[in-house]
Each structure stands twice: as C-alpha cells, then as structure tokens.
Amino acid sequence: MASNTLIESTSLRRSPAEHLAEAMAQGSTAGAVVLREIAFATQVGVRAVPGSAGHAALAAALGTGLPQQVGEVAGAAEGTAVLWLGPDEFLAIAPEGSGLAGELVAALGGEPGQVIDLSANRSVLELSGPAAPLVLRKSCPADLHPRAFGVNRAIATTLANIPVLLWRTGEQSWYVLPRVFFTEHTVHWLIDAMTEFASPTVA
C-alpha cells in the first residue's frame, strides 16, 4: 500500500515582496528613508463582542489585552500587537512562526467569537527614517502629525489610491499593510515617492 508523507519546509516559501527586495534596497537612502518587507509575520483576525466571555478569554490569551477604540494598538511591534479594526474586530500581529492562531482558538473554546489565520492576507512593509512621513503624505489623506497620529497607533486609510492599514510603530517607523495583491503596486509607489530623498543635498 502506498503511503503519503507530508514534509513541512519553509525553503520554498516566497513572501509577497521578496522579488522587490533589491529595488527596495536601491530606493532606500540611509539617514533619510528606508523601505523593507517584514516577511512572514503572523497575522490573526479576531472577532469577539466586548464584555463577552469570549472577548475576555482572547484578551487574556493574547497577553496584551484587546484595544478598545479606533486607532488604539495593544502591545508593540517587537512582540505581539493587536490593532483595532472595529468595535468587535481586531488584527493580531506576531513574529514569524508564532503559534498564536492555535493558542487563540484553544482559548476561545466554545464561546462565541472568531479566530482566523490571515497571515497570507496582507503584506507588511516597514518605512522608516526622518523622511518617512513626508513620503506617506504624498498620497495618504490621514493626518500624520504626531499630535494626531502618535506612536503605536494604527488606522485604516488609503495610500496610492488603495486601502491599507497604517501603523506608526516608532518615532520614525511605520508599518504599511496592503492586501497581498496590492503589494507590488504599493512598493513601486513608495520607491517612486522616496526618489527625491536620494538626491544629493544642494549647497
């Protein structure tokens, strides 16, 4: 009798922007603005009604709690973070290889709610450097001033006429999360918008 063997391997994986890595590196300027991909980040969609047993169980399992209002992020980019998408909808982001989805499913148990692995749904691009907000302002309609958009806040907005999640992860760093099929468009737009910052300083 023939037998089937399942071999798990990460060597054949390709991230959404892997083929654009060289272009991103060439378009970046150290000390001004740098673009790179955060490949294979774990992304888990979570839904639970605030105040419910399921909501409490998920908040505890995440270790960060769940954000309570628009723009709020629980946790931080260095570990597990949870972005507010709606009153009962959240996106948890964790490092590559995290078993977060399984942990949350187990925590939810039979309580009403939803946990879905969305790791292949969006790419994660990091734009960093003092010129990063200037690049984003060329096409993002959101108010990016620090008074309105502080560190560790995230919103749904548009960039280059496509919907993205925009998360300010640090004083000079931002995560841009487009749907996977918009990754190439987003990367090329960002590289083009970064071009002026690669020009030599005019004396």
Swiss-Prot record:
Molecular function GO labels: sarcosine oxidase activity
Top-rank taxon: Bacteria
Coiled-coil intervals, chain numbering: none
Protein's GO biological process: sarcosine catabolic process
The protein's Enzyme Commission number: 1.5.3.24
Matching Gene3D superfamilies: Heterotetrameric sarcosine oxidase, Probable tRNA modification gtpase trme, domain 1
GO cellular component, one term: cytoplasm
Keywords: Cytoplasm, Oxidoreductase
Keyword Oxidoreductase: yes
SUPFAM superfamilies, per the entry: Folate-binding domain (SSF103025)
Catalysed reactions, semicolon-separated: sarcosine + (6S)-5,6,7,8-tetrahydrofolate + O2 = (6R)-5,10-methylene-5,6,7,8-tetrahydrofolate + glycine + H2O2; sarcosine + O2 + H2O = formaldehyde + glycine + H2O2
InterPro entries: SoxG, SoxG_het, TrmE/GcvT_dom1
Transmembrane segments: none
Name of one Pfam family that matches: SoxG
Description of how the protein assembles with itself and partners: Heterotetramer composed of subunits alpha (SoxA), beta (SoxB), gamma (SoxG) and delta (SoxD).
Sequence similarity: Belongs to the SoxG family.
Function of the protein: In the presence of tetrahydrofolate, catalyzes the oxidative demethylation of sarcosine to yield glycine, 5,10-methylenetetrahydrofolate and hydrogen peroxide. In the absence of tetrahydrofolate, catalyzes the oxidative demethylation of sarcosine to yield glycine, formaldehyde and hydrogen peroxide.
Name of this chain's protein: Sarcosine oxidase subunit gamma
